[in-house]
Amino acid sequence: MSNVDSEESPQETTCEAVVLDFLAHGRSDDDRPQYQKDPLAYALGVEDFRLFECTVDGDATVAIGDRLVVDPPADRSPEVVSVRAVEHGDLSGGAQSELEYVVEDVVEAQEDRFVEFYLEAQPVTLRLHQLNLLPGIGDKLQEGILDERRRGRFESFEDVEERVAGLHDAKGVIVDRIMQELTEDDLKYRVFARGE
């Protein structure tokens, strides 16, 4: 767990995050009296799928699905007081159950970005291709995707599914891989979710 406040990036791009859960009375495992607890929001970064715990201004109202700017500190949404990066196990139960739905919404909203992955995926090692990192994609499907992308660009997930025999849920495969990267700490390769 690191403080996002202390990280400075050379290029000041804003990091937008979708709220997964809002705890108006803070964490339940916090033993302080209720009036001393700060409201918290758990959020998922839209670009790099980082998980955040945001301390929220006591007067602000935040709902699940709201979008907040969490980084850099100068550009933060007014309701966000502080932000820290967290791991999947640190999320509240509500945030954990909401996570897959939000990931699916992000993938759907940025379909071009993820279809581009099918077009741009490269070998990781001599024996392993980025496409093989996706759940359910073995050598046969990998070859099918590579053959079809040589013939022409994929326009959408539907186009990928129509042209590649055996690949029935192009979006679901991406969502499953992102969920693996968010929930499993011991993955050697990360394609979508930035590791801390």
Please give the residue ranges for each predicted region:
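Short, Lys/Arg-enriched anionic-surface-contact patches
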Residues: 106, 135-136
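Small-residue hinge/turn detector
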Residues: 138-141
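Structure-specific DNA junction-binding interface
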Residues: 1-106
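A short alpha-helix capping/helix-coil boundary motif
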Residues: 107-111
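C-terminal extensions
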Residues: 112-133, 143-196
